């Protein structure tokens, strides 16, 4: 459409979910749901993430919060404290000396907590895979929910990973993980 900025592929919210909600509210004038589903719906729109930027992928985390991509339009906002955050984004090479700190920060997060592993180094060690000091994937230290591939992944890839996490929360709920 003229006058609209082009939207990067994969950065629109789950349109079918919102169409179903608006259709039900439009037909009946109200929405019937369970408390658990209501909490899951609210949780997907208010994810507070904590950065665990270890290397060059952290620059893309900064990039995704700038006006061009504006991650806050999906209800995802950064927090400085692990006690206030629901999501941890691990970006970069995880060394053996940093692994206990990662676990400690993860343990300080409140439940339910989710982890996004961002980049080749966080996913499996990346370029430094065979080094004696590198953990071959942060999933050996903390449970990972979403893997975002790339070296470094683009801002669009991280946004897509966040949207996949929102879909996973809606699909599985908070009790099953």
Curated annotation (Swiss-Prot):
The gene is nuoB. One of its GO terms (cellular component) is respiratory chain complex I. Pfam families: Oxidored_q6 (PF01058). This is NADH-quinone oxidoreductase subunit B. NCBIfam families: nuoB_fam (TIGR01957), PRK06411.1 (NF005012). NDH-1 shuttles electrons from NADH, via FMN and iron-sulfur (Fe-S) centers, to quinones in the respiratory chain. Couples the redox reaction to proton translocation (for every two electrons transferred, four hydrogen ions are translocated across the cytoplasmic membrane), and thus conserves the redox energy in a proton gradient. It comes from Sphingopyxis alaskensis (strain DSM 13593 / LMG 18877 / RB2256). InterPro entries: NADH_UbQ_OxRdtase-like_20kDa, NADH_UQ_OxRdtase_20Kd_su. GO terms for molecular function: 4 iron, 4 sulfur cluster binding; iron ion binding; NADH dehydrogenase (ubiquinone) activity; NADH:ubiquinone reductase (non-electrogenic) activity; quinone binding. It is found in: Cell inner membrane. Binds 1 [4Fe-4S] cluster. The keyword S-adenosyl-L-methionine does not apply. The keyword Plastid does not apply. Belongs to the complex I 20 kDa subunit family. Keywords: 4Fe-4S, Cell inner membrane, Cell membrane, Iron, Iron-sulfur, Membrane, Metal-binding, NAD, Quinone, Translocase, Transport, Ubiquinone. GO terms for biological process: aerobic respiration; electron transport coupled proton transport. Its EC number is 7.1.1.-.
